[in-house]
């Protein structure tokens, strides 16, 4: 750049003690703006940024900008129309400073040291909250340009620097909300400003998410609903699905990963569809960040706003489900996460939302809307009476059928936990066999998803355990007899689940194929060292000994002719010995868990002695087991 020429052109502004003393008629103003445009363009070159920082020009620009904005905001001696010149000067100076600090920490420090804190925290925040400059709205384009450049300045100052962002966040978060609120119904007329503003708010909220007003949360949900209706179907490249899936399985991104390229001015036409998609992604991320991270949100006495928020989110999901657009999977997951986190807040009873959710379940085919509704309903059940009340609004059969529509792993969370809460001994008895088959099909499909989303495993196992516990043994036997693959599904869920299933099958008094029994015993005895707590806890050991005791007491379930030929003696005698050795070591323990396990072990030992007492020829392993059993007495 021709640095001397630029300095010469800016001399009247730079040398004046106050910018108010500088001539601002059209000729002079046009000259200043032209020189600053030249400077802003030249600052796209990194070497030129170094020059303005080291020569003091940047320092002077900060001073001029603060003076100009102070006149705009506080000087009542000049008319609003006369202030337009100062707003135009401010706009160009903001542009120059924004470009000067791109990827330049030295210049960022110059900005701070020269009074930049007040400039950024107060004056730029004020620019973001401008609604108009002139009463006739004739300068709306100037306001738009001022605000867009201010957002760029803030973004270029913060990007890649956590400390700067944390310091700026408390002062800028509110003005950014105001900026977005004023554009809610006209965002397509200033798309670049809105997208950049929402992106900056996204970064700000990552470090400053507490104490956001409930009304602002409602505003975000309202804005999301509006954008959702404007999103249009879009042809995506074949590779995008894979890219989206990979991104969506990543938890909240680290600050350092939030882009490494500062915004450098460009003159391009904004694609309306891209604006909707980008804004939808940014705002859904903003809302999710707040409701997921801020545990102090208090929804007390805000029931109507909460209901409206959840309605907005569910309607957005319904609207978006049938559309194809960029980052769809990420957005849909974030929206159900928003609904789930709002409903999980301890100050939210979710009772008002029950009608909305049951209506959604009965009328909608949108899997993501259904998932959100199931999450909300799940969080509305906190007691047995809550469960009874909810089942008057919707039946277990209806809920089970809804589960067939779920596909995305994240959609299953509310379904699994809600069913677990609602199932009990009484209503399980009346479940139709078709519903039970459907339920197990859903659980198996969900089980396949746990390979990719491990967080589902505990929810699935808990529901499976509850289902096996409350179902009559005859129904479990009929299920397994009709579909042998159910046994392998149960067995894959480990010791406790297999013990519950085995107990029920033993109680049914009906014979099962030996393969089914073997599969369960293999799962029950899938341990290496009982002494390692992480391998098997007291609770699991209690259930194993309980199941072994029941089995040995009534070994007729194996259809063996000779008691000594039962499957535990034939195939699992080493495991049985290891269990008894471990339990025997609990003999002197006084905790209830150890005492219960020891009592079960003593019961098993008595049965073993009864089995072998009339047997003339024992193998060495059986002799060792007999001696071990005697040690319990």
Features from the language model and the residues they span:
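Elongated alpha-helical scaffolds that mediate protein-protein interactions in large eukaryotic proteins
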Residues: 2-93, 99-149, 156-177, 186-196, ...
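Alpha-solenoid HEAT/Armadillo-like helical repeat scaffolds in large eukaryotic proteins
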Residues: 12-16, 63-71, 122-127, 182-186, ...
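HEAT-repeat alpha-solenoid elements in large eukaryotic scaffold proteins
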Residues: 29-43, 87-100, 147-157, 197-205, ...
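Fungal intrinsically disordered, low-complexity polar regions
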Residues: 242-266
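Eukaryotic intrinsically disordered, low-complexity regulatory segments enriched in serine/threonine
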Residues: 260-269, 582-585, 617, 631
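Eukaryotic tandem repeat interaction scaffolds
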Residues: 340, 358-366, 375-392, 397-408, ...
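C-terminal structured domain segments
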Residues: 572, 576, 580-603, 607-609
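Eukaryotic acidic, Ser/Thr-rich intrinsically disordered low-complexity regions
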Residues: 605-633
